[in-house]
Amino acid sequence: SGLHIDAEDLSLFGQLLLDDGVHEGARLLPEEWIRQHRVRQVNCDSETDPEWGMGYGWQTWMSSHGYPLDGAFGQYVLIVPEVDAVITMTNEASEGPGDKQAILQAVWDHLLPALADGFQPQPEEIVRTVPTVTGEFDSARSVQGIAPDGSYIVVSPHKESRAWAMSWRCPGTSSHPTDETLEIAVGYEEWQTSHCRVGDDAIDIATSGGWQDETFVARLCVISTPHTFTLRMIPEATTTEWDNEPLNPGGLLGLVHPELRR
């Protein structure tokens, strides 16, 4: 909600902290700051999330293993010196009691022992695919509608492949005062990714869809954020349902990030 750092750069920053603020032999962060940053400065209490009851340092929580940089919805950079590791996660967890605790507990119970033992998994063991949307492909069916936030959406089948083209016209926001149209590819029995430019900003979306009886259903994962939502369209109505409502208003335009230039 205001600061965007992609997963790669989050990992690099975590590595800098793991290396005590030194990068390629050069000290970038003061030694005293590093020392104070990762020790408890504030006492905290939490009955439902034990990790968050261990105290707070400088911009970081204390933890039973190392210490985490903690973002909303279960986004973490875990700095774990005991196994010389940085673990970066961009989850989409709810903010309910115990939900984020369960994520960390899974890391402590399963990933840390593997790292400590020097376990080297095979690629097929570490790659998992998010299930696609179930349904049918129909090359003769299109659908259009207006979402609750005023977005105008048109979904049309590709003529040369089993997929859809989605045109999503977003109403303007305070940061993007004019309407913007996103051209989004929708995969059938697969995920297709789209990099959409919005002025000097951008948004990255992975999408899968299918016809379920008379309803076109698509899942849109805004992969540059921890947010996913479901789109359902019939000629009479269009609905969108976020798994977890974003902190920023503005729908998809509220999730754009500065175009990264390396």
Where are these regions (language model features)?
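Structural helix-adjacent loops and short alpha-helical linkers that scaffold large soluble proteins
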Residues: 21-30
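Extracytoplasmic/secreted proteins, especially bacterial periplasmic and envelope-associated proteins
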Residues: 8-12, 32, 106
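Peripheral terminal and inter-domain segments
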Residues: 121-262
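Short Gly/Pro-enriched loop/turn and capping motifs at secondary-structure junctions
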Residues: 66-67, 75, 92-95, 223-226, ...
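Active-site Gly/Thr loop motif
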Residues: 34-89
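Active-site-proximal alpha-helical segments within enzyme catalytic domains
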Residues: 2-22, 75-92
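Structured C-terminal helix/loop/strand segments within mature extracytoplasmic catalytic/sensor domains
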Residues: 72-131
